[in-house]
């Protein structure tokens, strides 16, 4: 690394990695000089940093990332972390700074990437206390720091001398420059969704929900591909795909009009942002709206767009971003669907936000969705009903989220005593008026009864809202469906598609 031009290295001795395993009394069962008491367990690490210092010299920066609490019974807790610090402090001439991290490659894995389901910057208090034990050694702040003010706080109150940023720099590589120049309002904020982690693990490539330009050589600059011929782009819809396309097209030099059916932007992401753990999502559409306003986008809001509304704007091209709607699951018969007594996930989410009262009894959520918003609604339902039961025909819940987020979801569901039943689906709604829901096992058809049921909610697959597509094309317009209107997908797909479509116009 030094020969390649790097000025330092960080040794990752936390998060369950190899050096962590040597330090931990739970995982280190060795009986030689590298196991047993604490000094022996730390020997591998102390010998390593000594060798690096000897080879690379005093000017080469050596940082240590150490375990604070790993969440493993019999592993490393804060008292043990303090003891490890004491051993390493005796070798402080061989490293320049340290910090502490949480979680391990175990059921506590999710703790190493905290998100909005918990407190902001949750580890700073413990980092401050650990640092205070050896105040002459430089320390770093880390863990769910997404705002420049949080970083400044850690630097000013004695917690740290430097701040480590990972996910926020993926979302906006210019984060430090914008903060330093007084342009924090132009930062594209990390929403701590952990999609970057998932993409690296599952796809082998870096990607971000809120930064479609991640990985571009010039992503730290706000550059756009200027157009040679201005067009009037009408965007129908105001969700995140619509807004990404709108501000990108306007910054390129197009004239852009947005028609939205409410007076706010964000679409279904705005709903998710008001549910447990979703608050950071508001920064996605807040940024998009700010950029759109600054780029001169014209907004027509509180209007459910009809064909004549679009034609009246005389567009050169229409981006159709009218979202998606919940499908009717097979088990939901037409008579029950027509009565409107079994709401979709989104309908229940909106009712919870609107403030429906508390209801005794059991609420059943039929989960065919398996994404984060489903469990955000379930957790909010737990504040309004005596019991929540999740029913899914699949082999586990949260099947379509990353491992790290699934662990967090499971922890919170169990914390709230939310029951989940796998390999099952509704069999009959005949007893529902009497509070009974019959469910059957999808493999052996065995039927069982859920009692005291007061409401049933379905999280089903979604269908594109394309009611304007054919009539607009029949009027000779170029119409491009984007986002969920093209195909219901993830937040990442929505922002990326909006950005890339806008760059083809």
Language model segments and positions:
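Flavin-dependent oxidoreductase catalytic cores
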Residues: 2-236, 240, 244-251, 255, ...
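Short glycine-enriched, charge-decorated loop/helix-capping segments at active-site entrances
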Residues: 35, 112-117, 273-278, 335-336
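Rossmann-like dinucleotide-binding cores of NAD(P)H-dependent redox enzymes
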Residues: 255-294, 371-426
